[in-house]
Swiss-Prot record:
The gene is dapB. Catalyzes the conversion of 4-hydroxy-tetrahydrodipicolinate (HTPA) to tetrahydrodipicolinate. It is found in: Cytoplasm. (S)-2,3,4,5-tetrahydrodipicolinate binds at H135, G144, T145. PANTHER family: 4-HYDROXY-TETRAHYDRODIPICOLINATE REDUCTASE 1, CHLOROPLASTIC-RELATED, DIHYDRODIPICOLINATE REDUCTASE. This is 4-hydroxy-tetrahydrodipicolinate reductase. It is an enzyme of class 1 (oxidoreductase). NAD(+) binds at G9, A10, K11, G12, R13, V14, G77, T78, T79, A104, P105, N106, F107. Pathway: Amino-acid biosynthesis; L-lysine biosynthesis via DAP pathway; (S)-tetrahydrodipicolinate from L-aspartate: step 4/4. InterPro entries: DapB_C, DapB_N, DapB_N_CS, DHDPR_bac, NAD(P)-bd_dom_sf. Belongs to the DapB family. Its main location: cytoplasm.
Length: 248
């Protein structure tokens, strides 16, 4: 049989999509579907080698600690990771040479490419802003994808020695200019009928560039998740961002 996979958050919408994708893959074997009321020991009992975690920010750290301590690698799509949480994961992984953790703000290949293209474009434009649009049930704002996109843009601008973005705003309603992520404005929209969408707008004298990405259903995440599951054994330790598995 193939790689033995457990899915955490298996009863959720994304979790159900991942369960179906694993079941349809000849090289993967689904050995555990873990819901909120299930014991994580089922992963060990059923010999899971890799878990996929689409749970909640409140649950994910406990899940990761358990998996790492039991030698199970993890592909994580759950949001809510800040620098402190990432450092904690690195600490747990110390000395665990055969365990990998992939944390990705987005597993849709189109979203990964949007982040990569945005970082490439950043040094050519005076201004950049990020708009993310999601369904109204999303718990966090702005999205991890938008934050990661803005951080990449800011890092590229810093590397290029660029000045702060021009903005003469003196009076504004609170929040009207969005959240500042490393100096890049990020705007969050929550609206019925949407799933997961992002626009990155760049501007300089006489021209603009808009990079736009849309995920119309949760099936868009499955191919990227399976890339992670199939390749995590070659990437021990913590990796943040699916682009590192795609050679981008």
């Amino acid at each position: 049989m193939g790689i033995k996979v457990g899915v955490l958050g298996a009863k959720g919408r994304v979790g159900q999509t991942i369960v179906a994708a694993v079941n349809e893959s000849d090289d993967l074997e689904l050995v555990a579907e873990i819901g909120v009321d299930d014991d994580l020991s089922l992963l060990v009992d059923n010999g899971a080698e890799v878990v996929v975690d689409f749970t909640t920010p409140n649950a994910v750290m406990g899940n990761l600690e358990f998996c790492i301590n039991n030698g199970i690698s993890a592909v994580v799509g759950t949001t809510g990771f800040d620098d402190a949480r990432l450092e904690q994961v690195r600490d747990w992984l110390e000395g665990k040479d055969n365990v990998g953790v992939l944390i990705a703000p987005n597993f849709a290949i189109s979203a990964v490419l949007t982040m990569v293209f945005s970082k490439q474009a950043a040094r050519f434009f005076e201004s950049a802003e990020v708009i993310e649009l999601h369904h109204p049930n999303k718990l966090d704002a702005p999205s991890g994808t938008a934050i990661h996109t803005a951080q990449g843009i800011a890092a590229a601008r810093k590397e290029a020695g660029m000045d702060a973005q021009p903005d003469a705003t003196e009076q504004a309603l609170e929040g009207s200019r969005g959240a500042s992520v490393d100096g890049i404005p990020v705007h969050a929209v929550r609206m019925s009928g949407m799933v997961a969408h992002e626009q990155v707008i760049f501007g300089t004298q006489g021209q603009t560039l808009t990079i736009k990405q849309d995920s119309y259903d949760r099936n868009s995440f499955a191919p990227g998740v399976l890339v992670g599951v199939r390749n995590i054994a070659q990437h021990p330790g913590l990796v943040v961002g699916l682009e590192h598995y795609l050679g981008l």
